[in-house]
Amino acid sequence: MAKGQSLQDPYLNALRRERIPVSIYLVNGIKLQGQIESFDQFVILLKNTVNQMVYKHAISTVVPARSVSHHNSVQHHHIVQTQEMQAEVLAENQTE
């Protein structure tokens, strides 16, 4: 995972998991509203009366309708990253 996504993914996941309504502003000024159904590295699937696949490169701002408790998600994500790094170092040391 890219370093720049270490905040983005847990934040979007918290919005998705808690089904928080969001307003997504595109770089051209268009405002989209709905709930985040899913997302990946390149797109967000926004659900309202219809599903819209929104490319992340077209997004300027994501505004949740209420505050997001993403702190625990971010903290968990960093713990998992640390554990993965420790496992890699341990594996490297065992092969030496």
From Swiss-Prot:
Gene from which this protein is expressed: hfq
UniProt-recorded name of the protein: RNA-binding protein Hfq
GO MF: RNA binding
Gene3D superfamilies to which the protein is assigned, alphabetical: 2.30.30.100
Similarity-based family: Belongs to the Hfq family.
A family per Pfam: Hfq
Organism: Histophilus somni (strain 2336)
Protein function: RNA chaperone that binds small regulatory RNA (sRNAs) and mRNAs to facilitate mRNA translational regulation in response to envelope stress, environmental stress and changes in metabolite concentrations. Also binds with high specificity to tRNAs.
Biological process (GO), any one: regulation of translation, ncRNA-mediated
Assembly notes: Homohexamer.
Listed InterPro entries: Hfq, LSM_dom_sf, Sm
Keyword Metal-binding part of the UniProt annotation: no
Sequence ranges assigned to domain Sm in this UniProt record: 9-68
Record field: transmembrane: none
Alphabetized UniProt keyword annotations: RNA-binding, Stress response
Annotated GO CC locations: cytosol
